[in-house]
Amino acid sequence: MGATGSSLAVNNTGDGTAVVILNNKQMTTGEDDIDPAGQDTVMGGSITGGSNVTFIKEGTGTLTVGGTMDVETLALREGNIILNGTENSLDTLTLEGGGLTISGNAEIETITGTEAGGTLAIQGTLDLTGTSSINNGAITGTGSLRIREGAELALGGEARLDGTSVTADGTLTLTGTESGAISGLSGSGALSMNGGSLSISSATTSSGTFSGTLAGSGTLDISGQATQYLQTGNKDYDLAVRDGGVLVLKGTADAPTLNYNSITAGNNGTLRIEATGDAQGSANTTLNVENITFQNGSTTELIYNFNQDAPFGAPMLTAGTITVQDGAGFLLSNMKGNAAMN
């Protein structure tokens, strides 16, 4: 295996499970023997497997698949697999120490992990459609992780997120000991945390809107060039925005009040409390927080809907304790598209 343009198709006509070892072994010329560790291999074609066929990646080499990988089960024990195709599909991916890089697009139903863990690097787009649980290893990359409606990704133990943007129309559960880091959070599903911290930061301009449920307790920290919209709240969550980040708190017509435990607007961070809309019947957002701190160098924007008959009828901020440091900035403005005070 390994010739450029070649493909591999395996069908199992028996009753048991067929196992295919992908180890990149290459025959060489001269006095060299087969390299047991495996060499880097490029396949321009596809790898497909029928029912009850398990593919296992062994050997330290990297296998690059230019076509489609469409298999029932893939176990990563050693080395790496790079998927460059646009229609990859795996029923089950098991991280056992190796690595998988998705440079194109892939759909995976279930991801599991062993104590050895492994790395799933997303440079393209990955859609999760089932229930996945990982306690060791990492999901990294600059691509997009999409948790479909009804699907769940649970990261516990030492498993971590690092760099991807996340669309959670299903459920993302973070209960591990490692702090997570993503470039943006979108979706209408659920984020569940167990007292940990999730950093939302990007080296390039990014924007995400999350309108789902915040469950449990935790901290969301926004920084870099990330703009994060939150249309939901939880009194057991803490928020922080700093170092170029923008945090926009924007309620909805059905729930214009957002509740949090504490918020810190840090140096070079922007906190924006924005009305739910610019129509005459659209309410201003009310932020209800136990403690809020406006640090030196922070900017806080209160964006009202002046199309209302009584735009100042309800407060945009209520807090148990408010701390304002010298050098904190505040702006009051009108909702974009609203002509009443433009």
At which residue positions do the language-model features occur?
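Beta-strand-rich extracellular passenger or scaffold domains
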Residues: M1-N342
